[in-house]
Amino acid sequence: MAITFSVPGDPVPQPRPRITVRGRHGHAYVPKDHAIHAYRQAVAIAARAAGLVEATAPVSVIVDAVFARPKSHLTKSGVKASAPALPRPDVDNLGKAVLDALQEVMGDDTNVSRLLVEKSWGT
C-alpha cells in the first residue's frame, strides 16, 4: 500500500541544534521561532490526512523536495548559466526533517527500512 501526500511551500531542512550549557550539562535545542516547527506540523497534518497510521512493519519513505527557483536565477531567455543546478540544502537534512515530522504520526522511525531523498527545482 502506497500513501502519497504533498506539503505546500518550499521544504525546510533540519537545522543544526543550538547548544546551551548550564553548569556541567549541555542542552541541544532548536529555537522556537525556527521554520522547521511549522514545516514538521504541516508534514504531519498532510500525512494524517492521506491516511498514514502507525507503522508496525518496515516502510519505505520517498521524499521528493521541490524548491521554487528564485527570480535571480532567470533571464528573459531562460535560466542563467551561473544558476546552481541543485537547491542548497543537503538531502540528509531534508530527509531528517521529514522523518522527524512523521514520527508524530507513524511512531518511531526505526521501522523505516529505506529512505530515498531527491531535491530539484520546480517550474
Segments from the language model and where they lie:
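Acidic, proline/glycine-enriched N-terminal capping motif
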Residues: 1-123
